[in-house]
């Protein structure tokens, strides 16, 4: 099985640094980190994270971060973003405003 490295920086703090197995089906990269399932669409670059408690949908086309929790959906606007996809290396940087401005950077090497 193929492996990828997934890193998430939030406000320059490394929050996730994992090497996990993945597969691609219908141009969607599927992988799990702990109990969380991730789906990254290689065409639209949208990222969805789900577990038994909540879903986070980062939709760059709509410039929204959607969080679904206990039957409620919360929306946070993406202020700006950039996506670089070069030879099995994806770097996504985005900023959104919740209680404060949050800068995230996701790096996927596969």
Describe the function of each predicted region.
Residues 1-2, 42-44, 59-63, 86-91:
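A short, compositionally biased
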Residues 1-28:
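Long, hydrophobic N-terminal alpha-helical segment
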Residues 5-9, 30-34, 48-50, 92-97:
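Short beta-strand segments that buttress and anchor functional surface loops
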Residues 18-57:
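Short, well-structured hydrophobic secondary-structure segments
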Residues 29-31, 67, 100:
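Structured N-terminal alpha/beta-domain signature
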Residues 35, 53, 71, 98-100:
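Residue-level detection of beta-strand-connecting loop/turn positions
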Residues 52-58, 64-84:
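Terminal, non-globular segments
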Residues 89, 95-110:
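Mixed-charge, glycine-accented linear interaction segment located at domain edges/termini
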